[in-house]
Each structure stands twice: as C-alpha cells, then as structure tokens.
C-alpha cells in the first residue's frame, strides 16, 4: 500500500521530462519523421500542416498490409468484422478522399497494427521501408485521424473500434503509462455509447449487438493487461456491466442488415481464441483482485482450496466449450492457444 501511495504521489507531484518541452510538430523534425510526443491528439490537437492523403500507403501496399493484418493480427484481436473492414479498404485503395473520418482512423489503426506484427526484416522486404519509420508514420497518422474525427465526443462505434485497436497495438510498443491512462478513457467512451449494456437490452440488430460485445470484451482485456503492466488494480468490475460474451461464430456468419441472430457454432471458430481469453480474464480478476468497497464479505476470504476449485471449473469450461474441438494442426489450434499462457 505504501508503495502504491508513493507511486501515485510521484504521478501527481512530479512533472514528466517532457513537461518543459514544447510539443514538437511532425513538420518541425529535421528528419521528416513524426515526433515521438504522443499526448497532443488526446486533447484534439491535429496538425493543419500535414496532409492525411500523404500518410496513406500506396494501393499495392494497402493490400499487403491487409494480408499481414489478416494473417498476424486479426486471429488474435477480433475487434473488427473482417468483411466490413475489407470493403472500406477496397474503397480506400481507389480513392482515400471518399473515406469518412471514422473509416480513415480505422484504416490507419489497421496499418499500424499490421506493421507492429512484422519483424524489421519483413517490413523491409514487403514494404521497402524500415519498421521504425513505418511504425512512427502510421502511429502518428492514427493519432491525427482520431483527433480530426473528434473521437472524444463521437458516437461512432467504428471510431471507438479504431481507438481501442490502436491502444492494443501501442501497448506492445510503448512501456509508458499512456495505454494504462487511455484505457480508462476507452472505458468511459464505451459507457457513453452504452456498450457496457448488452445490445439485446435495446433491441439492437444482431450484427451491432455482436460488434459491441467484441469491443467491450477487448476493452476488458486491455484494462486487465495494462493494469498488470503497472501494478495496479483493474478498473473493470463485473458489477457495472451486463454485456454478454461474443458468440462462437465466424465473420461470414454475420452481416450488417441481418434480422435474426446466427446459430452459434460448436467447435473451433475465428472467435474461439478470443473467447478463451475473455473467459480466463474473468477468472483472473476473481482470483487476484477485489474492489476495496466490495460488499461481498466472502470476496476477500477465498481459501486456497476455493481458488483451486475456481481454476478447475474454468479448465472444465474451456475444455468442454472449446479445446475438445480444436485440431492443434490447423491455424486456430496450438500456435494461438499457446499464447494464452503468455
């Protein structure tokens, strides 16, 4: 407790090293590379001297990045509906000026995530540029696109998807408190859109209900992992949401205009890996964290045997719902499930 109080005092009382420096515009850099400062977009700063069109990849690179995204990122982070995102990407390859601001932010976050998943050698081979240069460009472009779209005051689900996906990617490249801090902002933005309540409460169509569920549960994972990164308790509490888990389905099972929910699949699907992560995250929170004001008198008194029982129960659920159907020789098998332990 003393250590936590000391850390919080440091956050509040000690200005960061950047406080005395002016926020550098990307255009002021001698190298032409975007600045390493990333706070401006949070407050809506958008450089009027930067052409967003110039930050987009070429049409051929757009499809290379899309293939990388499908192969490396989408199986592990299922915030998006792949067919819908592909349609946006096809439009962008022919005319970026036709993109809505929300769609542009989403595309830049996809480019950034794709580059983040590549090695430096792969970036040079596939895209003809260094990973460092591409990462800085698409991170800056995503930040600019979010600011220009007014993400803090927007009611666009797509824009929130772009923001959350961006934070998930940044967390693996930035060890500052940025993602931990902005994760709380993502939760509040999601609550403002009512995403903490299941879509069936509002008679939303099955597609929108499903996409809201995916987004909410990825925010949950982000909150848990970023809290672990900085030794704090997660913000999430099961008492303040009723959003159900996403369905165990493939993207081809849903589409925007559908009227009836799809039949949930039995076995391994495109959503299975993420569903297992979501189920595990709930158990981990119950095992490791208890809200200071929790009214449940037993919450703080779980014995070792009770915790072991909770773990065994989780193992049975995962085995019965998912693992028994998974072929470890196919893409959605062992390579992905092994990451549950990382």
Per-region residue spans from a language model:
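Intrinsic, low-complexity transcriptional activation domains
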Residues: 1-74, 96-97, 101-106, 111, ...
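Surface-exposed polar/charged interaction patches
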Residues: 7, 11-18, 290, 321-324, ...
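Extended, leucine-rich alpha-helical cores of fungal transcription factors
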Residues: 48-64, 75, 88-112, 116, ...
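Alpha-helical solenoid scaffolds in large eukaryotic transport, assembly, and signaling factors
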Residues: 76-81
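Cytochrome P450 core scaffold surrounding the K-helix E-X-X-R motif
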Residues: 120-121
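Flexible glycine/proline-rich, aromatic-decorated loop/lid segments
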Residues: 241-254
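The feature captures the short pre-catalytic strand/loop hairpin that immediately precedes
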Residues: 255-263
